[in-house]
C-alpha cells in the first residue's frame, strides 16, 4: 500500500492571548464567570498546520466479522487548499446540474414502477393551497418514503414506515394529515384533529415549523405543546381549539389528563414519529396511556428508523389489523446516508482533547457538530473552548427550554460554527449544511452512530464527513459497525501536526476554581457513562487508564471523585482513583460542588 507523505510545515508556536474586544458572542454565562476570575488565562500555543480532510485507506472487504486493520501506515492528509478548491468546483458543477430543481433524482420512476409525472408533488391529489406551499418551500419531486407513503395515507390507511434519518418522513406524514383536516373542514370549535408525537423538544419544534409553512394558506389552526415550556398558555390555546397539534409524549399526556378544554373526541389522525427513539428515552408507559385516551376510530401513522420489540408492541396496539408497511431502506447495502464520507481515528486517551482542539482550530470556517456522552462533559468542553477563543455553542438536556431553542435556531441559521452537544440533537433534526460530525465520545451502539452521522449529508447531492474517535482498545467496535452496514475508513493525523498544549491546559484548569470543578464533574461523568455502555466487551470501564483519561480533562493526576459505577467496577475504580493525589485537593480542600445525580442526562 502506497503512503502519501505530506511535506512538513515549519510553523512557529506563539502564545495565544485573549483580546476582550474579540470575545466570541457564543460564550456562555458560565464562561463569562470564568473570565471574571483573577487568574490569568493560559498561554495556549498556536496549533501547527493540520489538514481537515484526510485521505483514507479503505477497510478490507472480507467476509469476516472484524474488519482487517493493516499494519501499514494510513494515507496522510492532502493539502487543505487543494481540497477546498475541489469542493468549490464540485459544488458549482452540482448547482449547474440541479437546473433549479431542488429534488431531482430523489427517486426514479423505474424504482417505483410509476410514470415520470406521478413522482412530482404537483401531481398529488391534494389541495392547491398545499401544493402552493410545497412549491414555495422548494420541493418538486418526492423522496422514496414520500412517494411510497403519501398515496396510501391519502386513502386513509394506517401505515408503518421504516426509513433512515433524513429521508423526508416529515412531509410524508404532514401532507396527508393536513389533507384530512382540510377535507373534513375542521374548525377550532372541533378541537384537535391531528396529533403528532415527537421524542424531543427540538424535533417537535422543527416539525411544527414545517407544518406551519404547509398550512399558511389554510384556515385550520396549529400549535405545539412541549416539556419545559409554560403550561398555562398551552392550556389556553388548546381550549380555543388547535386542529393540528405537535407534542412531546410527557406534556401531551399531562394535557390529556388535566386540561378540561382539550377536545380530542374528533381526532382523525395520530402520528408517532421516531417511535423507536420515543421508547428508548423511557416514554413507553406514557405512549400506552396516550393510545388508550385517544379515540380508537382514527388513522395512525407510525414511523421508526429501526424495528424493535418495543416498537412492535406499540404498533400492535396503535395500528389496525392491516396496516401498510413501507420500508425504503430494506435492500440498502449501506445504512448511512449517501454522500457521507466516514472515518475513524485511533487516539490514546491523553491526546484526545489535543486532537479535538487542533481539528476545531483548523476548521473554524466549517459547520461542525461534536457529540459527547454527558451533559457535564458538554458543559465543561464548551466552557473551556470558549475560554481559549474557540467560539462554540452547547446543547444538552439540562438546559432550560428557551436556552435550548435559542441555541438550536442560532446554529441552524449560522453559515459556520461549532455545536457541542449530547444525543439530544442526534435524532431527526434537520440542520442544514453541516460539514463535519465529530463523535468525540463513542456512541452506545451502531444505531446511535447512524443517527449521529445523519445530521450531515442531508438531502439529495449533499456531502458531509464524519469522524469517530476510538481508543486503541476500542477497535473492536468496528466489527459492530461493519455488521450494521456502515463503511468506515481510517484517518491519520500525524502526531507532529497536533498542537501540544497539554501544559497550558493543565495550568488553565489548576488555576481556575470554576473550570476545575467543571472539569472534575465532566471527568466523573465520562467514566460513569463509559461504565454504562451497552457493549461492555469493547468499552470496558475497568480497562481505562485513569491517569491518561484525566489528562484529556486538564488534570496532571486523576482528581478525587466518588465514582458511582456498577458493582463489577466500583472497587477497582475507587482503588485507582484514591491512589492518585489530585493537585486540586491540596489547593481547594473540600470546596467541591455537591453531588449531581443527573450527570448522564442527555
UniProtKB/Swiss-Prot annotation:
Residues 1-108, 568-602 are annotated as: Disordered. One of its GO terms (biological process) is maturation of LSU-rRNA from tricistronic rRNA transcript (SSU-rRNA, 5.8S rRNA, LSU-rRNA). InterPro entries: DDX18/Has1_DEADc, DEAD/DEAH_box_helicase_dom, Helicase_ATP-bd, Helicase_C-like, P-loop_NTPase, RNA-helicase_DEAD-box_CS, RNA_helicase_DEAD_Q_motif, SPB4-like_CTE. A motif (Q motif) lies at residues 119-147. It is found in: Nucleus, Nucleolus; Chromosome. The Q motif is unique to and characteristic of the DEAD box family of RNA helicases and controls ATP binding and hydrolysis. It is an enzyme of class 3 (hydrolase). Its main location: nucleus. Residues 1-31 have a biased composition (Low complexity). Gene3D superfamilies: P-loop containing nucleotide triphosphate hydrolases. One of its GO terms (cellular component) is chromosome. This is Probable ATP-dependent RNA helicase ddx18.
Amino acid at each position: 500500500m502506497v503512503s502519501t507523505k505530506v511535506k512538513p510545515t515549519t510553523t512557529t508556536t506563539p502564545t495565544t492571548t485573549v483580546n476582550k474586544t474579540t470575545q466570541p458572542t457564543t460564550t456562555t454565562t458560565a464562561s463569562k464567570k470564568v473570565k471574571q476570575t483573577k487568574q490569568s488565562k493560559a498561554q495556549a500555543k498556536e496549533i501547527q498546520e493540520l489538514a481537515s480532510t484526510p485521505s483514507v485507506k479503505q477497510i478490507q472487504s472480507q467476509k469476516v466479522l472484524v474488519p482487517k486493520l493493516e499494519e501499514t501506515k494510513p494515507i496522510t492528509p492532502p493539502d487543505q487548499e487543494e481540497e477546498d478548491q475541489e469542493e468549490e468546483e464540485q459544488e458549482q458543477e452540482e448547482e449547474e446540474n440541479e437546473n433549479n430543481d431542488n429534488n431531482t433524482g430523489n427517486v426514479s420512476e423505474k424504482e417505483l414502477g410509476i410514470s415520470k409525472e406521478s413522482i412530482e408533488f404537483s401531481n398529488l391529489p391534494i389541495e392547491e393551497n398545499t401544493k402552493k406551499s410545497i412549491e414555495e418551500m422548494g420541493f418538486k419531486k418526492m423522496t422514496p418514503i414520500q412517494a411510497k407513503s403519501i398515496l396510501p395515507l391519502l386513502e386513509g390507511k394506517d401505515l408503518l414506515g421504516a426509513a433512515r434519518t433524513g429521508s423526508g418522513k416529515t412531509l410524508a406524514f404532514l401532507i396527508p394529515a393536513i389533507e384530512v383536516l382540510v377535507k373534513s373542514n375542521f374548525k377550532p370549535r372541533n378541537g384537535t384533529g391531528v396529533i403528532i408525537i415527537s421524542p424531543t423538544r427540538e424535533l417537535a419544534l422543527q416539525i411544527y415549523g414545517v407544518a406551519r409553512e404547509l398550512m399558511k394558506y389554510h384556515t385550520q389552526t396549529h400549535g405545539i405543546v412541549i416539556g419545559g415550556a409554560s403550561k398555562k398558555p398551552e392550556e389556553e390555546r388548546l381550549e380555543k381549539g388547535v386542529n393540528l397539534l405537535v407534542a412531546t409524549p410527557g406534556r401531551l399526556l399531562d394535557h390529556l389528563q388535566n386540561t378540561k378544554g382539550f377536545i380530542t373526541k374528533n381526532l382523525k389522525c395520530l402520528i408517532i414519529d421516531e417511535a423507536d427513539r420515543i421508547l428508548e428515552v423511557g416514554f413507553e408507559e406514557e405512549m400506552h396511556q396516550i393510545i388508550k385516551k385517544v379515540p380508537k376510530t382514527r388513522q395512525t401513522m407510525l414511523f421508526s428508523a429501526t424495528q424493535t420489540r418495543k416498537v412492535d408492541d406499540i404498533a400492535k396496539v396503535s395500528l389496525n389489523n392491516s396496516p401498510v408497511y413501507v420500508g425504503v431502506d430494506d435492500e440498502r447495502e449501506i445504512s448511512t446516508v449517501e454522500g457521507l464520507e466516514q472515518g475513524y481515528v485511533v487516539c490514546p486517551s491523553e491526546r484526545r482533547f489535543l486532537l479535538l482542539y487542533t481539528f476545531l482550530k483548523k476548521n473554524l470556517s466549517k459547520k461542525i457538530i461534536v457529540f459527547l456522552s454527558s451533559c457535564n462533559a458538554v458543559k465543561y468542553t464548551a466552557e473551556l473552548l470558549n475560554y481559549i477563543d474557540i467560539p462554540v455553542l452547547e446543547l444538552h438536556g439540562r438546559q432550560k427550554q428557551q436556552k435550548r431553542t435559542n441555541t438550536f435556531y442560532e446554529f441552524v441559521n449560522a453559515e459556520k460554527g461549532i455545536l457541542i452537544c449530547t444525543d439530544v440533537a442526534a435524532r431527526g433534526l434537520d440542520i442544514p449544511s453541516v460539514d463535519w460530525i465529530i463523535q468525540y465520545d463513542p456512541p452506545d451502539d451502531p444505531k446511535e452512530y447512524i443517527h449521529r452521522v445523519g445530521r450531515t449529508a442531508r438531502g439529495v447531492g449533499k456531502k458531509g464527513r464524519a469522524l469517530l474517535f476510538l481508543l486503541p482498545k476500542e477497535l473492536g467496535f468496528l466489527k459492530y459497525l461493519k455488521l450494521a452496514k456502515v463503511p468506515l475508513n481510517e484517518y491519520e493525523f500525524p502526531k507532529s501536526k497536533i498542537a501540544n498544549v497539554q501544559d497550558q491546559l493543565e495550568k488553565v484548569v489548576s488555576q481556575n476554581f470554576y473550570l476545575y470543578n467543571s472539569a472534575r464533574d465532566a471527568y466523573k461523568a465520562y467514566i460513569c457513562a463509559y461504565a454504562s455502555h451497552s457493549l461492555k466487551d469493547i468499552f470496558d470501564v475497568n480497562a481505562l487508564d485513569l491517569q491518561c483519561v484525566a489528562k484529556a480533562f486538564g488534570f496532571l493526576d486523576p482528581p478525587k471523585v466518588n465514582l458511582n459505577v456498577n458493582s463489577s467496577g466500583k472497587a477497582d475504580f475507587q482503588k485507582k482513583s484514591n491512589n492518585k493525589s489530585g493537585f486540586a485537593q491540596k489547593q481547594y480542600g473540600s470546596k467541591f460542588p455537591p453531588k449531581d445525580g443527573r450527570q448522564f442526562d442527555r
